[in-house]
Regions:
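Conserved post-catalytic alpha-helical subdomain immediately downstream of the catalytic base
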Residues: 129-198, 202
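Ribokinase/PfkB-type carbohydrate-kinase core domain
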Residues: 1-128, 134-135, 187-193, 202-204
Length: 204
């Protein structure tokens, strides 16, 4: 993460320039962390990096904290109800950074620490793709964002269609909520089962 230090930020920027020269697509998960930097610094740095990004992942407060773009009011109990402002925020990212051809976002309505509804939306060009809502009682809320990003990249490499891609990605994310510790130790078949059944209770 470029939040670690100025030298790390410069290294990231050099890598992004290299990617652009070689035509390599770049995925960025904004994933703001208040313990690592303040919002002003984050926005200055991320605005310098975003012109090299082709796919951006932005969730909850990431829009405003990392880019100064409003999409979410901070109320985690009604995240899914705010889908229209999420859409507007995603479109604003592509307007401000025209190199960014796609934006993905996870929406959550959390009723307790463990219980909540999860879904995702995916913008490519001017077309939105939405997933079903998954109701989840989390075993451990760690790594769901990483699981989402990893699944999204996996589907992009497989060149799956956008709807399948985002459905697979949110299924991987909610499945991770049922697994302890950092790693999403599941198979592609496990994730597909969740996609088809909307049931995150893992059976192997």
């Amino acid at each position: 993460t470029p939040a670690v230090s100025e030298s790390v930020k410069e290294t990231v920027l050099d890598a992004l320039r290299c990617c652009k020269r070689k035509g390599i697509e770049v995925v960025c998960d904004l994933n703001y962390r208040a313990k690592m930097w303040d919002k002003n610094t984050a926005q200055c740095v991320m605005r310098e990096l975003m012109p090299y990004v082709t796919l951006c992942i932005a969730n909850d407060e990431d829009f405003e904290a990392s880019l100064g773009i409003h999409a979410f009011d901070g109320d985690m109990s009604r995240g899914i109800e705010q889908i229209d402002t999420y859409r507007e925020g995603m479109q604003e990212i592509t307007r401000q950074f025209p190199n960014c051809k796609a934006v993905a976002s996870v929406l959550r309505s959390m009723y307790t620490v463990e219980d909540g509804d999860w879904m995702a939306i995916y913008l490519i060009g001017d077309q939105f793709y939405e997933t079903p809502v998954h109701h989840v009682h989390s075993l451990e809320a760690v790594g769901a964002g990483d699981a989402f990003a990893a699944a999204l990249i996996h589907m992009l490499k497989k060149k799956e269609n956008p709807q399948y891609t985002i459905d697979f990605s949110i299924a991987a994310s909610v499945l991770k909520l049922m697994i302890q510790h950092d790693f999403n130790i599941v198979t592609e078949e496990d994730i597909i089962r969740v996609m088809k059944s909307n049931d995150v209770n893992l059976q192997r």
